[in-house]
Amino acid sequence: MKGFEFFDVTADAGFWAYGHDLEEVFENAALAMFEVMTDTSLVEAAEERRVEITSEDRVSLLYDWLDELLFIHDTEFILFSKFKVKIDEKDDGLHLTGTAMGEEIKEGHERRDEVKAVTFHMMEILDEDGLIKARVILDL
């Protein structure tokens, strides 16, 4: 099973992220978002950032997860290449505890597209044939 695949969207970047469970989908979605920006295979997992989010549903949680990672990238000038996510149901919604691993942007990192924002446009999470997949469109 591939972790993610890109699809054509005019002036934006779109991808499907796949996983056997919701956590794996969220990890692969984060990896795909950073793959839009750089070759993540060349980004060392030298530093960690911890993220905690509570949202009312799966789609909102995915949006909030990616949006928080993009905020950290934009404010700390860091690229991520590895992710670990744990999702639990709580009384107030779904709670995500995640770790993103990467390093500060260096001259040697390939510069691809700049992601301006995560969008809700066409975002969905589907359960199909024992797998879960999520569609995400990023504003470039």
UniProtKB/Swiss-Prot annotation:
Keywords (A to Z) from UniProt: Calcium, Metal-binding, tRNA processing
Extent of the signal sequence: none
SUPFAM superfamilies linked: MTH1598-like
GO MF, one annotated term: calcium ion binding
Domain of life of the source: Archaea
Record-linked InterPro entries: Archease, Archease_arc, Archease_dom, Archease_dom_sf
Keyword tRNA processing: yes
One Pfam family per UniProt: Archease
Protein name: Protein archease
UniProt source species: Methanothermobacter thermautotrophicus (strain ATCC 29096 / DSM 1053 / JCM 10044 / NBRC 100330 / Delta H)
